[in-house]
Amino acid sequence: MAALIRNLGARAAVAALSAKHVVPAAGSTALRMASTTPVEPKKADKPTVRQPDAVARSHLSDFGRYVAECLPKYVQKVQLTAGDELEVLIAPEGVVPVLQFLKDHHQAQFTNLVDIAGVDVPCRKNRFEVVYNLLSLRYNSRIRVKTYTDELTPLDSACEVHKAANWYEREIWDMYGVFFANHPDLRRILTDYGFEGHPQRRDFPLSGYVELRYDDEKKRVVCEPLELAQEFRKFDLSAPWEQFPNFRNANPPAEVVPPQAPAKK
């Protein structure tokens, strides 16, 4: 009797071990299907290319809309450029109020004036564009404020809001001839004493009007009218190898932020 029990137990153990190594038909079919299914290639990550963040775009749009609602007298347009860069276009008389609002408002705190740039577009009625680049360290955010003027209309100086605007506005006055009212020390900063004209204007010749040289006889630097060794040539021509032909007479594409937020579905 004991031998019979041992024999039955051995057979049951052998059957259990063999059952573990048997792959059912359904499992083999699934294995074959999984091995033949095409695998989608992974997208290459380019660390040098910054992809726009949808959440950041939404927050910037909401903030630009909020600024336009708070300052409807000065804000003329709000737009997003390069995917997620906020620009606020304002009237010339709104430079100081808008910059003061962006600096002092608790939800903005754009206390750092990074730079002020000038742009000359002669085909416009107001040919000069002045761009204020602001940084908020509190919220790790940037914003651009743009305004416009012409050769005769001055802009209010931003020195009373940002002390860093002093030299930036002097540079724009020197290069473009944009006058800033109430500036504490508006004089040239890059060109030489007695320089005439503004070099960054589009109608200023590349060769200039005068030249400075050291005179061995007079033992000093003299300023004389420019003498060209060849006939003056005009280089303002379109070329087939120009890298950015679309931006010659057009602005970069921008996405306008509507005054009202889109309804949520």
UniProtKB/Swiss-Prot annotation:
<protein>
    <recommendedName>
        <fullName>NADH dehydrogenase [ubiquinone] iron-sulfur protein 3, mitochondrial</fullName>
        <ecNumber>7.1.1.2</ecNumber>
    </recommendedName>
</protein>
<comment type="similarity">
    <text>Belongs to the complex I 30 kDa subunit family.</text>
</comment>
<comment type="function">
    <text>Core subunit of the mitochondrial membrane respiratory chain NADH dehydrogenase (Complex I) that is believed to belong to the minimal assembly required for catalysis. Complex I functions in the transfer of electrons from NADH to the respiratory chain. The immediate electron acceptor for the enzyme is believed to be ubiquinone.</text>
</comment>
<keyword id="KW-0809">Transit peptide</keyword>
<dbReference type="GO" id="GO:0008137">
    <property type="term" value="F:NADH dehydrogenase (ubiquinone) activity"/>
</dbReference>
<dbReference type="GO" id="GO:0005739">
    <property type="term" value="C:mitochondrion"/>
</dbReference>
<dbReference type="GO" id="GO:0072593">
    <property type="term" value="P:reactive oxygen species metabolic process"/>
</dbReference>
<dbReference type="GO" id="GO:0045271">
    <property type="term" value="C:respiratory chain complex I"/>
</dbReference>
<dbReference type="InterPro" id="IPR001268">
    <property type="entry name" value="NADH_UbQ_OxRdtase_30kDa_su"/>
</dbReference>
<keyword id="KW-0830">Ubiquinone</keyword>
<dbReference type="Pfam" id="PF00329">
    <property type="entry name" value="Complex1_30kDa"/>
</dbReference>
<keyword id="KW-0520">NAD</keyword>
<dbReference type="InterPro" id="IPR010218">
    <property type="entry name" value="NADH_DH_suC"/>
</dbReference>
<feature type="transit peptide" description="Mitochondrion">
    <location>
        <begin position="1"/>
        <end position="33"/>
    </location>
</feature>
<keyword id="KW-0679">Respiratory chain</keyword>
<keyword id="KW-1278">Translocase</keyword>
<keyword id="KW-0496">Mitochondrion</keyword>
<dbReference type="InterPro" id="IPR037232">
    <property type="entry name" value="NADH_quin_OxRdtase_su_C/D-like"/>
</dbReference>
<keyword id="KW-0249">Electron transport</keyword>
<dbReference type="InterPro" id="IPR020396">
    <property type="entry name" value="NADH_UbQ_OxRdtase_CS"/>
</dbReference>
<keyword id="KW-0813">Transport</keyword>
<dbReference type="GO" id="GO:0006120">
    <property type="term" value="P:mitochondrial electron transport, NADH to ubiquinone"/>
</dbReference>
<comment type="subunit">
    <text>Part of the mitochondrial membrane respiratory chain NADH dehydrogenase (Complex I). Interacts with sicily; interaction is stronger with unprocessed sicily protein.</text>
</comment>
<dbReference type="GO" id="GO:0005743">
    <property type="term" value="C:mitochondrial inner membrane"/>
</dbReference>
<keyword id="KW-0560">Oxidoreductase</keyword>
